[in-house]
Amino acid sequence: MAASAPRFASLAKIIFISSCVTAGCTLLGMVYDSFAIFTHFICYSLAYSAAIAVLTSTTFFARRVWSPPKWRKGAVFVVFAQALVPLSLLIPNGGVELNNPERFSVTWMNLHYETAAVNELVQIVKKRPSDIVVVAEAKIQQLAEAFSDYPFSREVTSASLYVFSKFPLSKVTSVSNDNDRDFLVVEVRVKRRKFTLLAAHVRWPIYSQHAKTLANAAQWATRSENAIVLGDMNSTPWAAPFRRMLRDGDLKHSRQGYGWLNSWHIDSDKHFGLPIDHITYRGKINNTKFELIETEHSDHSAIRGEYVLAGKLTRKPRD
């Protein structure tokens, strides 16, 4: 029995150090692009660290290592440092003062080229009406009849991005990105006010162009007084490139105040996932509601936000 204690202590150290390394890489991903991929797994790293912290609190553990209180304090610190990151999503955004705003709603979903997912989204929109529906990974043949009650639509077929709107759309632009999918940029007119909508489907952060693409989105967002930037960003809210996009684009995250809300799922049963689909906004826009809508036929869930829009009044449209 005495001989097993040193082996246990060595194993405990290895496990503890591995949790610290994992946590460190995750936290570094909030600052450095090269570590950004680790932020995708912060909740799983947190669960691992929490399990280690529980182990250090047991009598079984205390009897087999030197100075167990220090181990416990270290384990709790690692858990606390990581927990602050996802918990930050519970802090709501501060709103801007708006005079006589207009209301609109937006739904986004990556359809994964599944016809069943298209039909599922149609049913979602019927139950939760949206003024604007934006989708990715679909073919125009799949969408031809699905959103026929939306009088305005635009697309960038090279990126498989589509916008369907009950409000007039204009100034459609396909914005190119180096070694990444194009953006779909369009101006949306809500009665006498307007905003720019940028839809994106960004490559994974393991590619070098990921950060440049998000930086380009921030740059385009600042060209308009009011903007909505949304899509499958393939990034968590805490990854360094995404945080920089929010900062440089003066964008707010619709998830703030609503929590984790995993939108892409690793497993078919959708028990494990990542929050990589986003709706962000800037200017004279406030977010009044944000929700995730679980789906069955795509690996992505739908996300929906409700907003109020103010700002400069445009000329009244001619009859």
Labelled PLM ranges:
Residues 106, 112-127, 134-319:
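Soluble catalytic domains of enzymes that build or remodel membrane lipids, polysaccharides, and related
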